[in-house]
Amino acid sequence: MAQVPAKAWKNYIARLRRLNNTAALKMESFLVHNDTSTDAGLKAALDYAYALSTTYGEGAAALSCEMYDAMAMLSGVNVPPAVPAPTADYGEVAQTVQGIMKWSKLPQSIGAGVGRLVKQAGVDTTMQNALRDGAEWAWVPQGDTCAFCIMLASNGWQKASKKALKNGHAEHIHSNCDCTYAVRFNEKTTVAGYDPEKYKAEYDDAEGGNWREKLNSLRRELGED
């Protein structure tokens, strides 16, 4: 079976993480040193958040294109080069930042929101190209994994479907998470270390009669509640 080596996958994840974290930290620093209580101050913060999400989102999308094309080559298929997904537009950025500000003015919380927008551009790139080419995808955990990511990973490899999207974006993007989608074009290709059967066993063994009950059980086991 052809595999993306674990070292190569971890390096890919680390590069994505640096982009997410750099954008988040720069946003935090801006908020620490600038007053956003005025209309002008808020506008400046939104402008900066948009600039960060665009610059670093483009980087995340480019990295995702590289990995997508590498998986296609590994699978031995001939598909068009991956196309970067659009980064968040100004309205999406403003909605994210102001939405967070309604419940938290902490720079860390708002910075994390900007980091999520950067990650979103990378994940959207993978998903949109997979839909274009009829590839399969799987949610591959990395590092400390939350209950929801375990549940997603338990699905294993699945045919790319718009059902996984909400308003054109991946539904499950959250802070402090290195998990992301991998793609493949045949059953002979995978990511080294990804074991969907292990995650399926964890999910199946969780108490509950439906997915919500099982998810809550996993959260209790992981100390998330």
PLM segments and residue spans:
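Domain-core detector
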Residues: 1-174, 183-225
